[in-house]
Structure formats: C-alpha cells, structure tokens
C-alpha cells in the first residue's frame, strides 16, 4: 500500500464504523513507519507500524492500517463493482452518499441494494416510471427495482427460461413493499403490451387476474403479518409467489408457497409487539351485533392479545384495513358465509386463550363449565366435556391397553396453546390452498409455459435470545447464501472465459460445513427429530447429544459450546456467530396435538372447520407419502416434524431456484427508529455483512473487480499516452478494435509496472483492486501539469495584449489631447463673436419691451374707463326696462284674468267633446292592430306601423303582379266576349292599383314629416350649443349646464332613432321605388330560399380553394378580398333582416378554416394561419354573436399555435419560423404589437419546453449542456433584439437561469446561496432535480456533499409546504385572441365596398351560380 502525504483513506471507528481521513505525515525512522491521519472532523490519529503491506494487528502493535479511499468521482457510483478500492468502508460510503441524495437503489454487480427511506416516495413507482423502465436494458437507466423486474421479464420472453427474484433482508427493510411493486410492474407492463396490440378481450381477462393476484397481498398480510419492535408490518412467514405465463407470455394465474409460519406468535407476544393483524381488524371492523354473536369485546380482554401492551399502531386504522381484507377475501373467491365462519374460528381462538386451567399439587384441572371454554366450543362446534378432558389428560397406547394419565399444569397450558396453534396454522394453510385453487385452476395448469417467482423471505436474524424460529430462518439464509456465492462465482468465471484472459481459481469462504452441520444424516435437525419422537425426549438430553456429537473436530469449527450453561449452543454462520437457547426446541419442533385432541377437533359440527381439517389431513398424507418415497422405513407413518417439513420445503425451493435464472434484491433497514432519511452506519454495516453483499465483494476482489470498455478507458486516460498519440482521440477519428487494444496497451505498459495487475480481454480491460485509483492519481497530476502550461501561455499572451493595448491607448490619448486643445481655441473665438452679437440683441430687446409695456398700460387704462361707462349705461337701461315691464304686468292683469276664465270654460267643453270622440275612436282602434296605440305615443310606434304597412303593400304588389300576369295571359288567349266579361275584374284591379298609389303618397308624406322632425332636432341642438357658448355670466352658465346635458342625451337618442328610421326608410323607399320590377324581392329570395347554395359557394369554394396572396401585391383589397366579400354579403343580409342566415355563414366559415389548418402541410400552415388570424379579426366588428365568434377565433388561434410548436424542433427551425411570421405579419398589414404578442407566446412555449427537457429527458447533465443551451438561447434573443421584441429575456428566464446554474461553479454553501440569488425563478425542488443529474467533466470537481444535502433538505421542506410543480406548463390553454389583439381597436367593417365589384372579381374558370346571379341583380 502507498500512504504518501495527501492520500485519502478510511479508518475504523466504534461510533460511525469508518471515518474519512487524510495522511498528513509519513516518516520512516528506525525501521518503523510513523503515520499521522487527520480525520474530516480534525482529529489526529497516530499510527506506528513496521509493515505497510499488512493489516495484521499482531504485527502492528494492535493497530490496524487504514483502508485506501476511492477518488471522489467514484464515491457515489451507481454500481459498487466499479469502485477502484472495493472494500467495506467504500461500499458503505457509496450507499450512504446515494441515500443522502435520495437515491435508495444501488447496484452491486448482479445484486440490487434497496435502502428503506421510511418516507412516501410514490413518484419512484408511478406509471410514468414503469413506462420509462419498460423495454430498457438495466445499464441504460438508473438503479431501480423496476430494472430488475424488467430484466427478469425480458429474459423470460427472449430466452423462454423461468425466472426468480429473491427479495431478502431483515424485518423492516422493505421486503414486502418491494415484492408488491414487482408484482405491480409485471401487471402494468403486460397490460400495456396488450393495450398496444388492441386485444380488448385479453385486457378484460387480465384485469380480473391482476386484481386477484394483487388481492392476495392484503389477505396474506392480515393472516401472516404482525407488529414487531423492528417493523409495524413484519411478515412472520416466507412466501414464494409464482406469476404464471402461457406460451404467448400472457399472465394466466399465480401460485403461492409459504414457509415456516411463526405459530408461537399466536400464544405469546413480547412487549410492544402484537399478534397477527387479523384479530385487531376483526375487533375494529365487525358490527356490534356480530361481536355479540361472537362474544367479542376489546383486545385488552383477551390473553392472546394483551401480552404485548399497546394494541394499536400509529397511523394505521384497523377498521379500514378490515374492509380491505374483506374485499380481498371476496376477490379471491371466499364468500361472505365462509368469511363469517372464519371469524367464528378466530374468535374461538381468542376464547381458548382465556380458558382458565387451575393448578393442583401434581396435576391440572379444567371445568367443563368454564365460560371461555363454553364460548370457544360453541363457536367451533365441539363438545365442551371431551374438549376439557383432553386438555388436562393424555393417553398412551400400548400393544395391550390404553393408559390415561393427568397432565401437569405447565403441560396443560402447552396442550391448550398447541390446539390453538394447530387450528390457526391449519386455517392459514387452508387459505393459501384456497387462493392457489382460484388463481391456478386445472385449466391454467395445463397451459403453464413459464413463470416468474418472487421470493419474499426473512433475512438473517440475530437477537439477544434466539430460538427454533431463528434457527430455521438462519438455516434458510445459509442455503440461499451458498447458492448466491456459487452463482456469483460462476458468473465471474464465465466472464473471464468469455473475455479469454489469464486467471487463476478464485477462493472464497464456503459455508458448506455449516449447512452439513444442520442437515446431514447426523446433523442438528436429525438429532432434533430423533429426540422429538422419544416419549421422554427433552431439550436437555438433546443438548447433551449435540455436545457429544459436534463439539469435536471437524464439526467444532462451526459448532461451539458456551463457557457457561448447558442450555445453549453456538453455530458459526456466514454472517456472525449466533447463540441459540435450546428451551422449547423439542416442543416447537413437534408442534402438534395428541391423537385424542385431534379426534375431538374432527368431531366438529362447524362445516368450515371440518373442511380445514380435511385439507390439513390431506396435506399431511402428501408429506408422509413423499417422505416414504425417499426413506423406506417402518417409521414412515409417523407424523412429520416441523423441522423435517421445513427442510423438505427448503430443498424443493432450492431445486426450483436452481432451475431458474435468479435475480437478487437485498433490502437494507437504515435505522431502528424508522425515521425518514436517517442513515445508521453501524446498523447498515451489520446488514451488509449479514445479507452477503460484502462476501460477494470479497469474491470480486479476489479476481479483477474493475473492468472498463476500451472506448471508455481511452476517453478517460488518453492523456497518459504521448502527446503525438492524442490526435486520434481528440479529432474523433474512428479506431478499429486492434487500434484501441494497441492504444490501451501502450498506456498500461508505460504506467503500470506489473502485468499481473491488469488483463486485456476481447472487449474489456480487467483491473486488480487499486489500479484505477493509481491511474486516476497520475491522470490528475498530468492534468495539473497541462493546466499550468496552458496558464503560462495564456498569461503571457494576456499581459502582452495589455502592453500593446496600453501603448495604443497612450497614442490615442495624445491625439485626443491635441484635438481637444484645438477645439478649445476655436470654441473661444466663436464664443467671443457670439457674446458681441448677444449684447447687441439684448439691448434692442430691452428697449422694445419698454415701449410695448408703456402701450399696454395705456390700453388697460382706456379699457377700464370704457368698462365703467358701459356698465353705468347698462344699469340705467335695465332699471328703465324693469319699470316698463312692471307697469305692463299691472295693466295686463285684469284682461288676463278674464281670458283665463274664458279659456278654462272653453277647454272644459273641448275636453268633453274630445272625450266622446276618443271613446268612439277607442272602440275602432281595439279592432285594429295594437301598433296604432304605440304610434300615438312614440316614434317607435311609427316604425312598427310603417313596417306593417310596407309588408301589406309588398303583399298587395305581389298580388297585383299575379293578377296583372293573369290578366295579360287572359288578354292574349281569350276571345273578345270573354274579355268583355272580365271588365269588372279589370276595374277592380285599377281600383286596387290606385289605392296602392295613394298608400305610397301617404308613406312619402309620413317620411317627409319624419325628416322635418330630424331637422328640428338638429336645429335645436345647434341653438343650445350656441347658447352655451354665448352666455358670459358664469352663474347662469352653471345653472343651465345640467339642463343642457339632459337635452343633449335626448337629442343623441333622437339621432340614433333617426338613423335607424332613415335606414328603414331608405330600404322601404327602395323597395317601393323598385317594387314594380321586383329586384329587391329577387335578392331576398336568393338570400332566404337559396341560403344553402349561397353558403356552399361562399364556404366550400371561395374560402377553401382560395390561395394566400403572393408577395408583390400591395392593395388591401387584394390581400383581404375574401373577408371583404364575406362582410359585404353579411351586411347585405343584415340589411334585409336575415341575421340568422348571416350567423350560419360566419360559423361555417370559421369551422371549416379550423379543419383545413389542422390537416395542412407544415410549411403552408404558418402563412395560411397568420393570414386568417388577421382576417378573422376584421369580422369582430360585425354584430354577429361576438362571444361565439371569439370562441371560434380562439380555437383557430390555438390550433395554429400547436402547428407552430410542432415545427420548433431545433434552434434553426425556430429562427426560420420567426422570420416567416415577422415577414408575413407586416406583409398582411399587421402591427408590430401583433408581431410582439405572437413571438411572446412562442417564447413562453420555448421556455417551458427547453426547461422540461433539461429536467426530464436528460439522464445526466454537465456544464457543456448548459453552454450549448445558452448559445441557443442567445441566438433566439439576438433575433428578438434585432426585431425589437420587448422583454424577450423575461420570457426565457427559467431555461436561461437553469443554463447558468449548470455553468456556475459551486464549491460551498456560500457559492450556492449566490447562485440561488441569480436563479431566483427556480425553486429548490427544480434546482435539486438539475444538480442531482449533474455529472462533472474530467477537469471539474464534483459538487460538495454538504451543498447537495442542504439542497435536499430545502427541497423537501418546499415540497411539503409550497406544493410547487416541478415542470412548467407548455400547453396552449392560456393563449387567446383577446390577449393577442389587446390594445388594438377593431376596424369597422366597410359597408361602402362595392359588392358587385367584388363578385365580378371571381375566377372565370370557376362556376358560382348563386353568387353571380346575386351580382347581376345588384348591378
């Protein structure tokens, strides 16, 4: 080993396991190395040793040498096998660093290490994450449990080989949750596969199967999981779930195998632990009536439930869990009636625990009237008398007789508990069998082609007191570890052979002696079974046999006897030595009930319980038959012990695993407090040793633990080759495999002294431990040397440029000084001349102002005198007129009184006469139309009467035309006598025609009066305005102001009504004027009766076949010809009152434009959409349901934006799109504000799109990504600045700040805080996502760990408080036409466009019959 000053290393520590240190001193004196290590906390550790190549404490004064540490670039690697120094602290530190970065998964070769976060991380298992890992190789994505599941699924499909995923770890490490997510992945990936193929029938079938498979989890957890001190949901059994596939790789079913249910938990629970979940769910979820039927109360009232203390779990609602369990039981085929029977059995077990057995001097007694006994027997359907008898007695069968004896108190308790355990274990096995019958029917069994097994099994257990359960669990882990070691060893050797390198046999510690100790013919299990079959067998005698058999060579290497006590034995497992307490081994191994008790249970009247016992008996017969087939002895009819059953099931499991392709997941529990994101070094270290990860690493270290591909090695270490060889790498020249091998060999042969430290294979280079760290060190030295050389040349060039710039500045400064002096001299002469001129002008101006001031004073005096004289004259005149007016009033008072009296009488008489006339007229008016009344009261009445009269007149005209036509035809085809007979009809026609003429004269008279009324209103308005201007008295003007405003509003209303009446008059006059030739009638008929043809011509021909005007035309009418034609026709329809038809035309036009732009070519879409966005804006001036038109315009605008978004693939395509929009916006007479709004919308989309790409699509980021994206942003901003787009930088601020974040250097938290002030728009969650993906380049240092930890804590707080989204919205929902044209007034539609001229411009090669006919009528 090399311990030069500056070497980073690890030193053992009792609190943290290992601490990071750096060598600060290394002196060699008197044959001893004096080394000083400085830890990260500043602690100095002195070490004295005589050998640097030994870690033997005996040779180094009981001091261990430190372990070398990996370079920073390798410390947080996602695969532990890539570490240069593959040792215990390096592995621990790598897992911890990834855990602190919220990466809970790490690869260790073929093993996935999963560290429990104790936090909700649902985003890691979302459907998006499943899709991301589907159909991807494991090396393409970050470590994840889905990568292992995908690898198993693809290998099963591609290689047609069964797969097994082994999920192991200690209680609370997350095994059960990991197994759940694996099952969810298989169901989701398989369903996605058939969704794409469109197999709807299969989707329905698979959804039912998937629901049943997933429903097994709540059932198995309720009956097999319990709360322990380490885990609130600890699995107390092993489970091997097989997901079955047919030949088409469809999921067709599932099968479950269970191992070693912890039966003793039913009758005993340690402090702070609980019994199985189902009991507490039953007590919380059952109704009150059902509880009364089952005699259930609270958990504290039952002995089997109150031993552990607390009966609840924080954060868990047992009533909700009960509902989930009930639903799952129904899903897997257990109906409500059977569920009720199951709850009866469970309630009976609780009552059995409360049976009170009384103790006497030598034996035990149990009354058949015990309340708990009566309740239990009632629920189980048993006889209380016989049941109580065989709880306290036993029967021994001899050849000649049967001997019945009493049991002691302790034996009676054991008998009672054995019955309860037997019933519960039988119920559990029956549930598993029932589930297998539902999920794996005979039809499914015939179509099974392959399967993927998920083994969720207990990890290595080592407590203060270890009993039979821990012995079986550790025995299973020994078998699995042996298989795992052989598997890893096999893979290592296969890769060496495949790469054709020189290698020697890898030695590793085999645990076969420990397995032989347990399972040999004279092993621990065999002796245990032998002792269990003896009537007088005991734990003490069995322990004595163990000591006599194994406490001697060669078995004493793995078996030991404790120094004190005779009730323990020690086994040296692969992980750690475990001391087992022998108390209870014999009883737990038997774990059965007497024949008498079994006969009592078989006599049950409970049908479900009878079925359970039948199933259990059938299973026992199967086990006995299998045992008889392998061992032909007279004892084959004996009941199998629990140990033999477990051994046989374990052998079957290993055979199954060995026949499949195995994948490994090791779950790690980071702390005992279950605190989120807390990492306990010592606890994790012990689990790494227990789960075999470190043993695997030792196997890898024995060979070549590090391996690099040729291309990766060249890209990283080409700097170590001579400089003349760099060109082939830096110029990106393609190198053949032979060239790459030669290049790698050139570097290695020059830098590494021994070829034993590396081997060059066919595709990779294999390195011994520590070689990569050495190469990294000399590469770092080389980079430093080259950096110094580059700095030297750059500084020389820099200072030379400063010198040349200084000389140039001096010369420029001299020239500027001379120029300034010359300008100052000329400026002085010019100022002198200007001063002389100013003095002259000032003197003349002062004299002129004095003359003007004198004249002004004279005029003011004259004005004041004249004002006084005029005022006096006006006062005298006012007094004179006032006196005359008073005299006139007095003289006129008497005649006026007489006149008023006469006028009052006259008015009274007139009122009475008018009243009589009005009453008569009222009777007549009631018969007429109601519009006559409104005609007297308002101008609106005149309008209605006029419209009615016009309609009647038009109908009369049509009738007269018809009669005229009839008359002319009769005149042509009828003889003179007949004509003579029609004279009366002719006379009637002439009379009617004369009446029409009179009506026309009447209408013209009414219109003339209406025009006179308008003129009077206008004159009144002018007189009032002149009156307002002519009044000089301020008080009088203010008093008239309010009256003037009211009069103005009335006149304004009259103007509006006058305009409307004028339009109606004009329309009516034209109809009356041209009524004889029926021109307007024909136009109305076209616009009403032929609407469909007109809409078809306008929409389907003119607009959809119209081409965008080519550049070069300048007239507005040519640009916007289609929309002008549409506006003209709509105005024409409004003129005739056909607004409903005009609505249909507008809606159909916009909807067809939306359909066309959706299917249009991308190149034409930009100009076409831009043209119609501007054109459709002109329609907003029409009074045609503006809300509906705006909605259609918004839809058209958003559709056009989506088409533009699809074209923005690269920065060049973005600039081309911007140029096109800019050019055609101005070409179509759009404003610069409109162009700015459109570009702003596109910039917002670019900001969201580029920012989201950095967050999601990029797996890794570096400063080059930021530099490239920054250059693209600069191109876009340069374009915006050149086209005067305001605030363009603000719309790209998110992606711009993200690029700066990737480019800025962060060396400590202070730097990071400065970066946060610059990146103020980025949340902590977004910065954490970016920096987590950041990977330093070869010249960079990685981001410090304390910065990442600080950012992680900030992001977690922000996620829980602010609820901010990680990504930006890149959709079109926020864009609208109202925002696009905000601040731009709507251009009024030009009603003076010559519609006939527009219609005549139609293409001559097209046939538009309705439009051309309309044009001919309007010509």
Curated annotation (Swiss-Prot):
UniProt feature coiled coil, ranges: 909-940
Region (Actin-binding): 451-531
Residues of the IQ domain: 783-805, 806-830, 831-854, 855-878, 879-901, 902-931
Domain named Dilute: residues: 1143-1357
Alphabetized UniProt keyword annotations: Actin-binding, ATP-binding, Cell cycle, Coiled coil, Motor protein, Myosin, Nucleotide-binding, Protein transport, Repeat, Transport
Domain Myosin motor per the UniProt entry, residue ranges: 75-780
Domain Myosin N-terminal SH3-like: 4-57
Subunit structure: Homodimer. Interacts with calmodulin (CMD1) and the myosin light chain MLC1 through its IQ repeats.
PANTHER family for the chain: DILUTE CLASS UNCONVENTIONAL MYOSIN, ISOFORM C, MYOSIN
Name by which UniProt lists this protein: Myosin-2B
């Amino acid at each position: 080993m090399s311990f030069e000053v500056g070497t980073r290393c690890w030193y053992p520590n009792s609190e943290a396991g290992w601490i990071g240190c750096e060598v600060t001193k290394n002196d060699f004196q008197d044959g001893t190395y004096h080394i000083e290590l400085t830890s990260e906390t500043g602690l100095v550790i002195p070490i004295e040793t005589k050998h640097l190549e030994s870690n033997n404490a005996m040779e180094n004064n009981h001091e261990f040498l430190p372990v070398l540490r990996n370079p920073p670039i390798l410390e947080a690697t996602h695969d532990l096998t890539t570490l240069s120094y593959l040792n215990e602290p390096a592995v621990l530190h790598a897992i911890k660093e990834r855990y602190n970065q919220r990466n809970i998964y790490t690869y260790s070769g073929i093993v996935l290490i999963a560290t429990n976060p104790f936090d909700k991380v649902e985003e890691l298992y979302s459907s998006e994450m499943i899709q991301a890992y589907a159909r991807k190789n494991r090396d393409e994505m970050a470590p994840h449990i889905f990568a292992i599941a995908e690898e198993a699924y693809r290998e099963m499909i591609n290689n047609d080989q069964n797969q097994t995923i082994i999920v192991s770890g200690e209680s609370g490490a997350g095994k059960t949750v990991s197994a759940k997510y694996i099952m969810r992945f298989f169901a989701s990936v398989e369903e996605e596969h058939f969704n794409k193929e469109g197999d709807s029938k299969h989707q329905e079938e698979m959804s039912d199967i998937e629901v049943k498979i997933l429903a097994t989890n709540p059932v198995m957890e309720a009956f097999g999981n319990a709360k322990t001190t380490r885990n609130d949901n600890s699995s107390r059994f092993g489970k091997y779930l097989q997901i079955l596939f047919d030949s088409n790789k469809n999921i067709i079913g599932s099968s479950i195998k269970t191992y070693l249910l912890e039966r003793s938990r039913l009758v005993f629970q340690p402090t702070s632990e609980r019994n199985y979940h189902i009991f507490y769910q039953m007590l919380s979820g059952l109704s009150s009536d059902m509880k009364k039927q089952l005699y259930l109360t609270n958990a504290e009232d039952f002995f089997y439930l109150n031993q552990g203390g607390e009966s609840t779990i924080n954060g868990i609602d047992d009533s909700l869990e009960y509902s989930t369990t009930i639903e799952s039981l129904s899903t897997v085929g257990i109906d409500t009636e059977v569920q009720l029977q199951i709850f009866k059995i469970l309630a009976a077990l609780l009552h059995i625990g409360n049976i009170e057995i009384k103790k006497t001097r030598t034996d035990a007694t149990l009354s058949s009237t015990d309340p708990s006994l009566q309740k239990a027997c009632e629920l189980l359907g048993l006889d209380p008398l016989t049941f109580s008898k065989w709880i306290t007695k036993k029967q021994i069968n001899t050849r000649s007789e049967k001997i019945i004896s009493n049991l002691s108190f302790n034996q009676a308790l054991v008998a009672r508990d054995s019955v309860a355990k037997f019933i519960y274990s039988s119920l559990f096995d029956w549930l598993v069998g029932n589930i297998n019958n539902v999920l794996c029917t005979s039809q499914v069994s015939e179509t099974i082609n392959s399967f993927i097994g998920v083994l969720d099994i207990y990890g290595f257990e080592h407590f203060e007191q270890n009993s039979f359960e821990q012995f079986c669990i550790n025995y299973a882990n020994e078998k699995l570890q042996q298989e795992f070691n052989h598997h890893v060893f096999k893979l290592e050797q296969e890769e060496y052979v495949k790469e054709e390198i020189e290698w020697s046999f890898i030695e590793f510690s085999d645990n076969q002696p420990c397995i032989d100790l347990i399972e040999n013919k004279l092993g621990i299990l065999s002796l245990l079974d032998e002792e269990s079959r003896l009537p007088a067998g005991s734990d003490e005698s069995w322990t004595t046999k163990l000591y006599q058999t194994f406490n001697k060579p060669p078995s004493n290497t793995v078996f030991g006897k404790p120094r004190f006590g005779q009730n323990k034995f020690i086994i040296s497992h692969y992980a750690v030595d475990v001391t087992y307490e022998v108390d209870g081994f014999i009883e737990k191994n038997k774990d059965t009930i007497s024949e008498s008790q079994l006969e009592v249970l078989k006599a049950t009247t409970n049908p479900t319980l009878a079925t359970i016992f039948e199933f259990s008996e059938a299973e026992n017969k199967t086990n006995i038959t299998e045992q008889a087939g392998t061992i032909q002895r007279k004892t084959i009819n004996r009941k199998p012990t629990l140990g033999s059953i477990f051994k046989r099931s374990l052998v079957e499991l290993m055979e199954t695993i060995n026949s499949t392709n195995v994948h490994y997941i090791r779950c790690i529990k980071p702390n005992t407090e279950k605190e989120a994101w807390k990492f306990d070094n010592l606890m994790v270290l012990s689990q790494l040793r227990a789960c075999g990860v470190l043993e695997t690493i030792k196997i890898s270290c024995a060979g070549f633990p590090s391996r690099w591909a040729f291309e990766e090695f060249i890209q990283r270490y080409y700097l170590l080759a001579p400089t003349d060889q760099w060109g082939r790498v830096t110029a990106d020249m393609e190198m053949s495999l032979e060239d790459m091998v030669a290049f790698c060999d050139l570097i290695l042969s020059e830098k590494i002294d021994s070829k034993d430290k590396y081997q060059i294979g066919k595709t990779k280079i294999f390195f011994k431990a520590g070689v990569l760290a050495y190469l990294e060190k000399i590469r770092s030295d080389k980079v430093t040397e080259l950096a110094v050389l580059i700095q030297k040349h750059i500084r020389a060039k820099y200072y030379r440029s400063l010198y040349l710039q200084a000389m140039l500045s001096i010369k420029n400064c001299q020239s500027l000084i001379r120029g300034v002096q010359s300008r100052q001299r000329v400026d002085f002469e010019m100022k002198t001349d200007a001063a002389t001129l100013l003095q002259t002008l000032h003197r003349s101006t002062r004299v002129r102002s004095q003359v003007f001031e004198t004249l002004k004073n004279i005029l003011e005096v004259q004005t004041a005198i004249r004002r006084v004289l005029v005022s006096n004259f006006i006062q005298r005149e006012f007094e004179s007129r006032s006196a005359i007016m008073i005299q006139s009033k007095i003289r006129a008072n008497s005649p006026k009184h007489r006149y008023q009296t006469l006028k009052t009488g006259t008015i009274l008489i007139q009122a009475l006469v008018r009243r009589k006339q009005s009453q008569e007229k009222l009777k007549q008016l009631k018969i007429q139309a109601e519009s006559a009344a409104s005609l007297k009261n308002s101008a609106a009445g005149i309008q209605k009467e006029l419209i009615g009269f016009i309609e009647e007149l038009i109908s009369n005209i049509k009738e007269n035309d018809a009669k005229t036509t009839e008359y002319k035809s009769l005149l042509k085809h009828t003889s003179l006598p007949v004509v003579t007979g029609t004279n009366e009809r002719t006379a009637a026609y002439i009379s009617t025609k004369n009446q029409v003429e009179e009506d026309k004269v009447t209408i013209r008279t009414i219109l003339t009066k209406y025009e006179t009324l308008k003129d009077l209103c206008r004159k009144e308005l002018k007189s009032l305005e002149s009156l307002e201007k002519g009044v000089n008295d301020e008080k009088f003007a203010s008093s008239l102001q309010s009256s003037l405003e009211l009069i103005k509003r009335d006149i304004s209303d009259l103007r509006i009504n006058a305009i409307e009446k004028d339009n109606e008059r004009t329309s009516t006059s034209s109809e009356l004027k041209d009524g004889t030739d029926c021109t307007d009638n024909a136009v109305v008929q076209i616009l009403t009766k032929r609407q469909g043809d007109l809409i078809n011509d306008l929409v389907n021909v003119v607009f959809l076949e119209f081409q965008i005007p080519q550049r070069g035309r300048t007239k507005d009418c040519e640009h916007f010809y289609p929309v002008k034609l549409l506006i003209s026709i709509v105005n024409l329809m409004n003129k005739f009152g056909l607004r409903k038809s005009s609505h249909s035309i507008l809606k159909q036009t916009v909807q067809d434009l939306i359909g066309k732009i959706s299917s249009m070519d991308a190149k034409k879409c930009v100009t076409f959409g831009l043209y119609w966005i501007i054109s459709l804006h002109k329609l907003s001036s029409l009074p045609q349901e503006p809300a509906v038109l705006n909605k259609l315009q918004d839809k058209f605008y958003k559709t056009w934006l989506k088409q533009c978004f699809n074209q923005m693939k690269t920065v060049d395509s973005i600039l081309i799109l911007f140029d096109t929009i800019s050019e055609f916006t101005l070409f179509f007479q759009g404003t610069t504000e409109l162009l700015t709004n459109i570009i702003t919308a596109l910039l917002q989309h670019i900001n969201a799109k580029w920012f989201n790409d950095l967050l999601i699509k990029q797996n890794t980021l570096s400063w080059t990504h930021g530099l490239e994206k920054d250059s693209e942003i600069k191109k876009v901003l340069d374009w915006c600045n050149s086209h005067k787009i305001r605030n363009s930088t603000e719309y790209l601020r998110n992606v711009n700040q993200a690029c700066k974040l990737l480019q800025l250097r962060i060396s400590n938290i202070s730097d990071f805080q400065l970066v946060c002030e610059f990146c103020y728009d980025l949340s902590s969650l977004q910065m954490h996502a970016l920096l987590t993906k950041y990977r330093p380049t070869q010249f960079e240092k990685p981001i410090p760990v304390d910065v990442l930890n600080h950012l992680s804590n900030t992001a977690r707080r922000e996620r829980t408080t602010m609820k901010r989204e990680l990504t930006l919205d890149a959709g079109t929902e926020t864009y609208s036409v109202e925002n696009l044209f905000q601040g731009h007034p709507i251009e009024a539609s030009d009603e003076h466009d010559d519609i006939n001229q527009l219609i005549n411009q139609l293409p001559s090669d097209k046939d538009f019959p309705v439009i051309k006919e309309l044009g001919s009528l309007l010509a």
